[in-house]
Structures are given as C-alpha cells and as structure tokens.
C-alpha cells in the first residue's frame, strides 16, 4: 500500500504510479490536496499505470492509517526525523508506505501515526531526494526483501 500526502508535481505523481505498479503495490491512497491524478501530465507520465493500479482519494489519511495499524499492517513513514535506514526495516509482512509533499514532507500527525519512521541515508551535503526517487528506493528494497531473501532462505 502506498500513501501519498499532498504531492504537487504531476510528473512526480505519474512516476509514483509507474513505480508502484512495477513494484507490486496493490493500492495507492491519495490525500485530497494531491495534484489531480487525471491531469494530462499525470496521465501521460503514468504510462497507463493510472488505469491498472487501484487508487482512491481519501479525505482522512490519518484515520485510514489507524485502521491499517489495527489490522496489523506495518505503516512506514519516510521522514527526515527517522532513526533507522530503510534497508534496516523488515518489509516481510503487510506494509504501507507514507510519502509526503515535495517541499514539506509528511504532516506531523501522519508521520506520528506510522509504526516506524525511516530515512534514506545521504552522503555529501544532500538532505533529501525527490519523492518519486525516494519511493523507488524504498519500494524496491521491499521487493528485494520479499522476493529474493525468501528465495535465498
């Protein structure tokens, strides 16, 4: 499951849809203040993923987060305040991934709802990556753990 809060750039949203489909995500939840998924640039940049991957626009991502946690879904927030690197987390069970606005990240409330806050370690003077790039890194770590670690073990 992918949660997207207040994504504003149509190209980012389109890339997030394509990446989510390629990584086997089964549903995307969008906050109401996310760019229109049917805007021409989003539709073009999804390369059709918009029409194959189930998604919904949610009024209240926070209550949805609480319901998922009650259903024993691990909820991971990508947040600069995270204390654990994304590759140190276990994505073996049911998981939801929270990604926030390009400039401001996740709201404090949604970030605090997460089971665990993660970060992508950075070298040099870079503080963060583009939201679509970050999602790609984390989703493919989940794919690696689920597919390849099981096969090796």
Stretches found by the model and what they are:
Residues 1-153:
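Post-transcriptional modification and biogenesis factors for structured RNAs
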């Amino acid at each position: 499951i992918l949660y997207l809060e207040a994504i504003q750039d149509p190209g980012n949203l389109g890339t997030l849809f394509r990446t989510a489909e390629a990584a086997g995500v089964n549903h995307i939840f969008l906050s109401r203040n996310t760019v229109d998924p049917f805007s021409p640039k989003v539709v073009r940049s999804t390369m059709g993923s918009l029409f194959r991957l189930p998604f919904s626009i949610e009024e209240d991502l926070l209550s949805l987060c609480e319901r998922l946690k009650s259903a024993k879904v691990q909820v991971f927030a990508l947040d600069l305040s995270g204390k654990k690197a994304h590759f140190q987390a276990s994505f073996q069970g049911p998981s939801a991934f929270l990604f926030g606005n390009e400039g401001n990240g996740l709201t404090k409330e949604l970030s605090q709802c997460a089971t665990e806050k993660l970060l992508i370690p950075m070298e040099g003077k870079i503080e963060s990556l583009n939201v679509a790039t970050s999602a790609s890194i984390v989703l493919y770590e989940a794919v690696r753990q689920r597919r390849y670690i099981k096969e090796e073990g």
